Structures are given as structure tokens and as C-alpha cells.
Amino acid sequence: MSLTLLPAVDVRDGKAVRLRQGESGSETDYGSPFEAARTWVEAGAEWIHLVDLDAAFGTGNNRDQLREIVHELGDRVNIELSGGVRDDASLDAALEAGAARVNIGTAALENPDWTASVIKKYGDRVAVGLDVRGHTLAARGWTREGGDLFETMKFLDSVGCLRYVVTDVAKDGMMSGPNIQLLSEVAERTDAKVTASGGISKLDDLRAIKELAEIGVDSAILGKSLYARAFTLQEALEVAK
């Protein structure tokens, strides 16, 4: 079974950045978000994971810039939009921009009724981001705790969630390897598909994630590993086949 790869473009103050462990202020600047996204498309990406960090942290938004990226590249690549989607206005803006899929995070923890309604309405166009420390969820830009992972999943499964994007916060941007145990625990507890995020640092990490395909881990987000040139996207796509 093949693994779908989603190169990440995280946007802060109009620039493409990478954070360490999701902490505001830890970013490394990688220049133009549009150029970053275009680079991954030209290298063969079928999906881009596009994140508005300002919206996630509540420090403004980069909505116009993200909309422009979707508009310019959306006919060549599927775009998953993430960051600060927690109400009808932000969800509608993301969907109207042309995103193939939208990740909701904090909202799923703070407003379960709303989350249930959008999962019912939009189905597989909505994924829920589960940002985890241990078995505890981290909320709003990872600065607050949001309850037990498996209790939250039980609720989300009951309302028909079809995809989880699972990030081990301690691993994100640290190039220290993915949390295979966490991914296995999540995938074994749900019929939903699982996207792995955080910690991927070498091609063997992708091989390890690919072995979880039969229990429902069908995709992986690549961030720091690509920007730090640990491997090329072409090499990763070859492994993911």
C-alpha cells in the first residue's frame, strides 16, 4: 500500500517558517510561502499541507496569501488548509478558497457540537488535527491542554470523523523520528484514516510509517526534513510508492 505525502508550508507573518515543538518564537524563516509550495508541486507533490500559524496562535491571519496560493496552484495539487479553523467564518473561508480538505483542531476540543455538525455536513473534506503530548491533547497553537486523546477520539468517531492528523508535539520540528507507538494506538482504535505528522527525519521513518498502512495510516506530512534537506521529495515519494 502506498503512502500519500504532504509537504508542509507553515506561514507566519507572510513568510514560510518551521517551528520547533510548535513553539511561537522558535521559527526558522524559509522565505516565500508561494515559492515553497510551488517547489513541492514541481517536485511531484500531489498534496500540500498549508498552515496559517498566525491564525492558530491567534496573532492575526495570512488568509489572503493562503487563498492566493490555493488559487494559483489548486488546479495542480490538492491543498489541505490548517490553522485557526474553529468557526463557520474560518471554515467557510478555507473551503471557499478552494481547499480540498480543511483541518480543524482547537475547535474540536472547545466546541464539540459545532465540530459534529461540520463533520456531518462536509464528510471527508474535514479532518481533525490531534496534537498530542503523551495521551493529552494540546489546544490553541499547542499552548493549552485540551483533554484526553482517546476520550476525544471516541466522541469524534461517534459523529463520523473520517480522518485524524496526528502530531506528537514533542517530536514536531525536532528531526527525532516519529512516534510510531502513538500512531499505532490511534489507528488501532478507529476506522478513520490517519495522517502522521511530526518528527520524520529520514527515509527509514517513512518506511516505518508505511508499515502501518494496513491499520489505516495512509499519509504523512513532511516539514523540517524537506527544508533541512535530510532527503529530497523525489526520494521520499519513491519510498512511499
Swiss-Prot record:
Under InterPro entries, the record lists: Aldolase_TIM (IPR013785), His_biosynth (IPR006062), HisA/PriA_Actinobacteria (IPR010188), Isoase_HisA-like (IPR044524), Isoase_HisA-like_bact (IPR023016), RibuloseP-bd_barrel (IPR011060)
Keywords from UniProt, A to Z, are: Amino-acid biosynthesis, Cytoplasm, Histidine biosynthesis, Isomerase
Q: Has keyword Transmembrane helix?
A: no
**One GO cellular component term:** cytoplasm
Which cell locations does it reside in? Cytoplasm
Coiled-coil regions listed = none
Q: In which pathway does it act?
A: Amino-acid biosynthesis; L-histidine biosynthesis; L-histidine from 5-phospho-alpha-D-ribose 1-diphosphate: step 4/9
Q: Which residues form the active site?
A: D10 (proton acceptor), D131 (proton donor)
Q: Which Gene3D superfamilies match?
A: Aldolase class I
Q: Which reaction does it catalyse?
A: 1-(5-phospho-beta-D-ribosyl)-5-[(5-phospho-beta-D-ribosylamino)methylideneamino]imidazole-4-carboxamide = 5-[(5-phospho-1-deoxy-D-ribulos-1-ylimino)methylamino]-1-(5-phospho-beta-D-ribosyl)imidazole-4-carboxamide
Q: Which GO terms describe its biological process?
A: L-histidine biosynthetic process; L-tryptophan biosynthetic process
Q: What's the Enzyme Commission number for this chain?
A: 5.3.1.16
Q: Which GO terms describe its molecular function?
A: 1-(5-phosphoribosyl)-5-[(5-phosphoribosylamino)methylideneamino]imidazole-4-carboxamide isomerase activity; phosphoribosylanthranilate isomerase activity
Instruction: Tell me, in one coarse class, where this protein mainly resides.
Output: cytoplasm
Q: What are the cysteine partners in each disulfide bond?
A: none
Top-rank taxon, per record:
Bacteria
Which family does this protein fall into?
Answer: Belongs to the HisA/HisF family.
For this protein, the record's HAMAP family field holds: HisA (MF_01014)
Task: Report the PANTHER family cross-referenced here.
Answer: 1-(5-PHOSPHORIBOSYL)-5-[(5-PHOSPHORIBOSYLAMINO)METHYLIDENEAMINO] IMIDAZOLE-4-CARBOXAMIDE ISOMERASE
- This chain belongs to the protein called 1-(5-phosphoribosyl)-5-[(5-phosphoribosylamino)methylideneamino] imidazole-4-carboxamide isomerase
Traced from the root, the source organism's taxonomic lineage reads: Bacteria, Bacillati, Actinomycetota, Actinomycetes, Bifidobacteriales
Q: Which gene encodes it?
A: hisA
